[in-house]
């Protein structure tokens, strides 16, 4: 039985396109990642019509759906079994994600304990070898 979220609203993003850096299309040495323009004559900073848009607080997501996964859960990073038990009372709101540096031996323990506690994991199959490969 899979665990379902307690509350699953429609997640609406105000803007899905990335904000790109001014003149990053013109020069290869400038990456596309956003950097705030600081020049005194910069037309992006002065918000001229037809220029790139600058990120601001108005593009923020709805507070209830911020950091929410498409499944309706919020992510919680888990490094060991003890951290997983924090999610026991919040298993309808948060799902666990096993951290990158956790060994495959500990991963098996975390996955087993998550099933017992009925806590959902985003990456339960990560780095788990089957019996035939061992």
UniProtKB/Swiss-Prot annotation:
Keywords: Ribonucleoprotein, Ribosomal protein. InterPro entries: Ribosomal_eL32, Ribosomal_eL32_CS, Ribosomal_eL32_sf. The keyword Chloroplast does not apply. SMART domains: Ribosomal_L32e. GO terms for cellular component: cytoplasm; cytosolic large ribosomal subunit; cytosolic ribosome; nucleolus. Belongs to the eukaryotic ribosomal protein eL32 family. GO terms for molecular function: structural constituent of ribosome. GO terms for biological process: cytoplasmic translation. Transmembrane segments: none annotated. It comes from Drosophila melanogaster. It comes from the Eukaryota. Disulfide bonds: none annotated. It holds the Pfam family Ribosomal_L32e. PROSITE patterns: RIBOSOMAL_L32E (PS00580). This is Large ribosomal subunit protein eL32.
